[in-house]
Amino acid sequence: MNKEKFLQDAKANYVENPTMARVYDIHGGKYFVTYNGYFGMIFDKADNVENLFRNGVCNFASMSNLFSNNTVFSSGKILLSPYKEVEYEGMPLQVLEYMPGESYYNVYIQKEFMKYFSKDAEFYSSAHSWNKIHISGVFVVENGEIVGCIMPVNVDRR
């Protein structure tokens, strides 16, 4: 996980677009930092990100619940496998796939966010049903710990 690069990019983006930048207080002395609304990474208190942006730390129960160790995968988790890269309206996308039952589903995320994670990172989504597409975010896991969350651009069936 490349925390330093992420923090550099977050600070630079904050100057251009401060309304999307947030530091959320989540569980267990951790913070979720996002700078564009589509992607964020998890930091420890020791990383000193509380004052990264001028608006300080936000406390939203829904964000804290999203990353709660008890609820993040309470309805099941699906491993998403990198499938291929595509381009949509000039934006490079990484396609992740999963197969509930007999139908393959593609989950499209912005490729640029992949640079912050190791090659061994795993991608998961929580699912309410194996028969329905319900993805509120792609969780990035390194060494068994959730380190980030990416919002999908699109989900489809092939």
Each model region followed by its residue ranges:
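DNA polymerase processivity clamps
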Residues: 1-158
